């Protein structure tokens, strides 16, 4: 059933020891065998049970419910398991508060007090008048939901093992050395205390001194000395120690201190270990000071610069936002703008904010664009009339005069605004790894892309590639029309150059293109294609040019110019009578253009109306004389060719025809 007993015992050894002590305090003794059997059943039917164990009563109630469900399904649950489960649940009930949580400090204190009583009874039997006092101290949170079980093992489990005869070897005072004192700062050296009263034990256990290693989250760090006359952290109240005094007798930790926390906690701890006492002490806040003696009316009040730390939650949100959405996502831009305009950030603050949020490659880009923007701003300051006395060292927070925070805190508002604009501009130019910034000329609207999406992409690319705001606005307005698809261009064309002053050109373009590409627009285009009507209301029946007038939209036969000429000719010809007989047929008084006669007055056919005869075959001509074909056997009967031509020439109609040369030669 599940894992073997040896594995269960080794896995839950520390927790089993604690449960036995807890039950022993309540007057109940449970054998280790029965507890191992209980945890075997829990391991089988409750796989969610933590390896470190739990003191929460809700978890043990949940174990009971799941064991009941397993029993209803036919699984056999031994009776001893039910008894042990009920005993443990009853033992945990007194430790529950109104919030159903376990006060671990109370549990530890009560258990250690029981150990104290048992030890006192044993010591009184051997030596009289000797006793040992244990002082319990809360070292963890009040709720078991936030209990660090690693710390729980460090404090309790060695003591329980010692009570069972398997405790760790104790180190004498001469051999005890603070753990890690060679490489830890003063605020993190483990506390080593001597016992208040020496305990005479047997010869195998001489008087000892134990080390107490507080967790990293609870270690006390002295407030850093500030350069400005005020501490960076509030000092501890007078009359008590900055951290609760450790007990007079502590146990050697079985594991190194837990380093739980986010990356931000590690950065803060690292900066403090390196001696950076001013880490995370930003931004600067200006507070008016009360007027001093001799102050005149109307004199501006004196202002004192102070630091106020950002919350850890805000810095964590910045880091997670950059990691999930990217440094230039709409969420990150909005968050960064609110931070930049809501606080008085100096160059040191911008550098710390970028280091904590950006990756190394992104921070390198930010620093590069920051320096580039500073050089451009310095040129503008020098060219201004009058020149602005703000140099590059002040905008970068470097040099002899601006390298410290106290010097940067005295920067003028104009310099703070310039640093803000430069850093925001540099942040916008940060690119994600593997991505490139395209040219604004290559940003074109797709055939099915909404016009607002196209304009948003165009503005984003122009903002990254064009520094001057006026030039960027002109380029965006131009490319919003030139790079749009034909449908949006036809809708924008009537507005181009006619937008009234004071109105946003891009907003008017977006209004004009509203609905293009949708179902209504497609239906309208289909209806216009069927009826031959376009948006302008023109009729399109022919796409070519007229051969008469050269205009587009009609054929020559429908040309209005030609029809107008025909009407004019008819009006001019039919309005008067012909002066004489028809010059063509000579038979009537009508115009020659209106003559339809086929014969003239003499009966001769007129040209153009005579019927043509049958077409004749073309005559063959060549360099050789034509020899008629004569079949064999008829050559003697055929007369010579010369006689044939002589007979033909005697005919009256062929008297003038000369004989062929071949016939003459014969």
Swiss-Prot record:
Segments of this protein annotated with the region Disordered: 165-205, 217-264, 598-641
GO molecular function, one term: nucleic acid binding
Lipidation (N-myristoyl glycine): 2
Residue ranges covered by zinc fingers (CCHC-type): 544-561, 580-597
Gene of this entry: ERVK-7
Other information: This protein is synthesized as a Gag polypeptide and as a Gag-Pro-Pol polyprotein. The later is the precursor of the Pro and Pol proteins. It is thought, by similarity with type-B retroviruses, to be generated by -1 frameshifts occurring at the Gag-Pro and Pro-Pol genes boundaries.
Main localization of the protein described in the UniProt heading: membrane
PANTHER family assigned to the protein according to its UniProt record, in alphabetical order: ENDOGENOUS RETROVIRUS GROUP K MEMBER 24 GAG POLYPROTEIN-RELATED
Protein name (database record): Endogenous retrovirus group K member 7 Gag polyprotein
């Amino acid at each position: 059933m599940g894992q073997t007993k040896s594995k269960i015992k080794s896995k839950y050894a520390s927790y089993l020891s604690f449960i036995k002590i807890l039950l022993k305090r309540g007057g109940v003794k449970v054998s280790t065998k029965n507890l191992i059997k209980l945890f075997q059943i829990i391991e089988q039917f409750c796989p969610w049970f933590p390896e470190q164990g739990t003191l929460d009563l809700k978890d043990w109630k949940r174990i009971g419910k799941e064991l009941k469900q397993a029993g209803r399904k036919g699984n056999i649950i031994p009776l001893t398991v039910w008894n042990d489960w009920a005993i443990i649940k009853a033992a945990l009930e007194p430790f529950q508060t109104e919030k159903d949580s376990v006060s671990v400090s109370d549990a530890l204190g009560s258990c250690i007090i029981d150990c104290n009583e048992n030890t006192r009874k044993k010591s009184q039997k051997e030596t009289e008048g000797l006793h040992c006092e244990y002082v319990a101290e809360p070292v963890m949170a009040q709720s078991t939901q936030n209990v660090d079980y690693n710390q729980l093992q460090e404090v309790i489990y060695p003591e329980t093992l010692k009570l069972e005869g398997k405790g760790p070897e104790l180190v004498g005072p001469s051999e005890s050395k603070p753990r890690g004192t060679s490489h830890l700062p003063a605020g993190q050296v483990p506390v080593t205390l001597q016992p208040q009263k020496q305990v005479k034990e047997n010869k195998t256990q001489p008087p000892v001194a134990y080390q107490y290693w507080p967790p990293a989250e609870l270690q006390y760090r002295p407030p850093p000395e500030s350069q400005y006359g005020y501490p960076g952290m509030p000092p501890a109240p007078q009359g008590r120690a900055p951290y609760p005094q450790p007990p007079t007798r502590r146990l050697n930790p079985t594991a190194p201190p837990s380093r739980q926390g986010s990356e931000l906690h590690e950065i803060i701890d690292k900066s403090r270990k390196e001696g950076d006492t001013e880490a995370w002490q930003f931004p600067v806040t200006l507070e008016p000071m009360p007027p001093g003696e001799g102050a005149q009316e109307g004199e501006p009040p004196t202002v004192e610069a102070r630091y106020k730390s950002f919350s850890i939650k805000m810095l964590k949100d910045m880091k997670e936002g950059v990691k999930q959405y990217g440094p230039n996502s709409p969420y990150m831009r909005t968050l960064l703008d609110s931070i930049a305009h809501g606080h008085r950030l100096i160059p040191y603050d911008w550098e710390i904010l970028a280091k904590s949020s950006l990756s190394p490659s992104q921070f390198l880009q930010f620093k590069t664009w920051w320096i580039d923007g500073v050089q451009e701003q310095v040129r503008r300051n020098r060219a201004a009339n009058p020149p602005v006395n703000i140099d590059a060292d002040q905008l970068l927070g470097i040099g002899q005069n601006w390298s410290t925070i106290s010097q940067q805190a005295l920067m003028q508002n104009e310099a703070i605004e310039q640093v803000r604009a430069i850093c925001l501009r540099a942040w916008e130019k940060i690119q994600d790894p593997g991505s490139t910034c395209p040219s604004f000329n290559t940003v074109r609207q797709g055939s099915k892309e909404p016009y607002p999406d196209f304009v948003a992409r165009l503005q984003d690319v122009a903002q990254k590639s064009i520094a001057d705001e006026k030039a960027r606005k002109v380029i965006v307005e131009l490319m919003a029309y030139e790079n749009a698809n034909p449908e949006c261009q036809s809708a924008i064309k009537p507005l181009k150059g006619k937008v009234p002053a004071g109105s946003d050109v891009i907003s008017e373009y977006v209004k004009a293109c509203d609905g293009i590409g949708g179902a209504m627009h497609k239906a309208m285009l289909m209806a216009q294609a069927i009826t031959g009507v376009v948006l302008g209301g023109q009729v399109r029946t022919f796409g070519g040019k007229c051969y008469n007038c050269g205009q587009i939209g009609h054929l020559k036969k429908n040309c209005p110019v030609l029809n107008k000429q025909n009407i004019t000719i008819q009006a001019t010809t039919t309005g008067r009578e012909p002066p004489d007989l028809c010059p063509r047929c000579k038979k009537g008084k009508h115009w020659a253009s209106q003559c339809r006669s086929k014969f003239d007055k003499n009966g001769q056919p007129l040209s153009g109306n005579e019927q043509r005869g049958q077409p004749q075959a073309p005559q063959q001509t060549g360099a050789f004389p034509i020899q008629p074909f004569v079949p064999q056997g008829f050559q003697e009967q055929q007369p010579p060719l010369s006689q044939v031509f002589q007979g033909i020439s005697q005919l009256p109609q062929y008297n003038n025809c000369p004989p062929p040369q071949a016939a003459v030669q014969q």
